[in-house]
Amino acid sequence: MKKLRLSESGARGWFIGDFPEAVVRTKDFEVCWQGNKAGHIDTPHYHKVITEVQLVTAGRMIINGEEFGPGDIYVSEPGEEYRAHYLEDTQVVAVKFPSVPSDKYYI
């Protein structure tokens, strides 16, 4: 067994996936635990290959005009454009599959 810290793994909470800092390295999927501050608005983007699933564990956010809160899940399919606006300090668990760290295209 290993004991590790999230702060010692990948950027922005990504701790499983196909990148050197991952605590488990795999090309199959990526996992992160991430917090975003109230008022933050992501740059709109999409993925060509991956599907991304986010579970909101705390806080509230709007993605493409739809409000999400604790227990809500968002699924983004390849090619779907989206942007998150955080209404409150928000925490999410996100999974992307497959793991293709370069598959993010800003609009």
Language-model segments: which ranges?
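A short, N-terminal "cap"/entry segment at the start of jelly-roll beta-barrel domains
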Residues: 1-33, 43
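Short acidic-glycine-tyrosine-enriched beta hairpin
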Residues: 5-6, 64-83
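Short histidine-centered beta-strand/loop micro-motifs
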Residues: 23-25, 33-34, 42-48, 64-66, ...
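Conserved hydrophobic/aromatic beta-strand scaffold that supports enzyme active sites
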Residues: 31-35, 53, 73-75, 94
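A generic "binding-loop/recognition-motif" signal
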Residues: 49, 67, 80, 88, ...
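Glycine- and acidic-residue-biased ligand/ion/polar-headgroup-sensing regions
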Residues: 49-62
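A short hydrophobic beta-strand segment most commonly corresponding to one strand
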Residues: 53, 88-107
